[in-house]
Amino acid sequence: MTGYQTKITRIRAQLASEGAAGALLSTPDNIFYATGFSSVMDGWHLVEPIAAVFVPTATASPVVLILPEASVISPIVSERGGHPVHFDRLATFDMLNFCETARAEDAHLALPDDLLAELGDVMEQVEGQCEPDIVQSIAACLSRHVSKEEQILFDDLRVAARVEALTRQASGDALDVMFAARAVKTADELDTLRESGQVADAIMSYTISQLGVGKSWGEVEKQVAHFMINHDVDPLPGSPMLFGGAYDLVFRPDLFRTPVS
């Protein structure tokens, strides 16, 4: 059994003990835990979810990853980078002008044939139609796999409230289930903790060595960033780099919420 299968099995066992029909996870940490999927937009700390995963209690039902239609290629890119994304089926939703931009033809980009073939395979795993937003995509996904009387546990109760208002889906809190499932680490997680822990210790030791009277924290940060880069550790999340840096007081990604006329 792979690390991914072990995680899903643990989640399902906890769901069964609670008498729930499944879990709908829409927070980045839980999505990554259950599928290995992460989005560059996670670093923007948007107030709305940008992906979700439905983990049914029944082993015969599929684990469904819900993501923007424009991000369907993401699992392929991630796997090619050595980070496979695990799911049984996909469901999609629109994301305003983010999807409009992604659908536009790029005159300077020609996708290789093998990538197009893989994309075709992934598209065959998409169920249902592309919904207008993530809440409607979640609601449609649940309606395909469970009845509205069966309880679904959510890790974001705002999402639960919206879905319940839309379809009267019975809902509950997934907090205890996910804590219990994640408390016991898989072999892969333990290996990662051992490896990353040594690197983190080295970075902290170097940081302490750079502290001194008269030094600004900005100077220390620059030195530590160089040390991290030299040890193959990315000192910045990828998302701010898309726009030249983390301009927290200037840039907000509201352009992705603006309707396209």
What is each residue range found by the language model?
Residues 1-199:
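A composition/biophysics-driven feature that prefers long, compositionally simple stretches
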Residues 15, 211, 228:
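Hydrophobic pocket-lining residues that define ligand/cofactor binding sites across diverse proteins
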Residues 34-44, 157-161, 165, 172-184, ...:
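Short catalytic-site patches enriched in acidic/histidine residues
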Residues 61-62, 69-70, 209-214, 218:
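Electropositive, surface-exposed helix/loop patches at the edges of structured domains
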Residues 183, 191, 205, 213-214:
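Glycine- and small hydrophobic-enriched segments that form the cores of compact globular domains
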Residues 197-208, 217-225:
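Active-site pocket-lining segments that scaffold enzyme catalytic pockets across diverse folds
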